[in-house]
Amino acid sequence: MSLLFMISVGFSLSSLSMMVIQPLSLGLMLMLMVLCVSGLTSLIIFSWYGYLLFLVYVGGMLVMFMYVISLIPNLIFLSNKVFAYFFFIFFGFMMMNFFVMKELVSVEVKSMSLFDYGYMSMGGSGIIMLYDNFFCYVLLAVILLFVLISVVKICYYCEGPLRVFKFK
């Protein structure tokens, strides 16, 4: 049922993103869609893959929308019409999923085999979390720290690519 809910939210957000025109609103819609897609990925494939996908998307979106937002003035963020449209589309997808899946899911068919290790989100990839792979995690942390220091050095207050904000 949570998979149907996530799919409904994803389709609702993707249809809602066509109505929004301001960069802040588009950034919010894109972040919510990324959260939905990474949640779906972690439910279907592996939880660590969804988490990694979320981090990559968020990192790219933060840099891109910082440039866009610094150049465009802030306008009206979201209107009530957009929220009404979102809830209408969301409930439409939820009802459609409910009526389509009602015949496929029955209470008698549920068994305890769903709680086996093979059906969990990690699926058999628990070997990634072993002590032997600790060096890979340390190397990844050092690389991410180096990238963080590089980005901070590039975007220093007076030397960065962003425009300088002068407060009065």
Swiss-Prot record:
Keyword annotations of the record: Electron transport, Membrane, Mitochondrion, NAD, Respiratory chain, Translocase, Transmembrane, Transmembrane helix, Transport, Ubiquinone
Major site of localization recorded for this protein: mitochondrion
Compartment(s) of residence: Mitochondrion membrane
Catalyzed reaction equations: a ubiquinone + NADH + 5 H(+)(in) = a ubiquinol + NAD(+) + 4 H(+)(out)
GO cellular component, one term: mitochondrial membrane
Function of the molecule: Core subunit of the mitochondrial membrane respiratory chain NADH dehydrogenase (Complex I) that is believed to belong to the minimal assembly required for catalysis. Complex I functions in the transfer of electrons from NADH to the respiratory chain. The immediate electron acceptor for the enzyme is believed to be ubiquinone.
Family: Belongs to the complex I subunit 6 family.
Protein name per Swiss-Prot or TrEMBL: NADH-ubiquinone oxidoreductase chain 6
Native source species: Heterololigo bleekeri
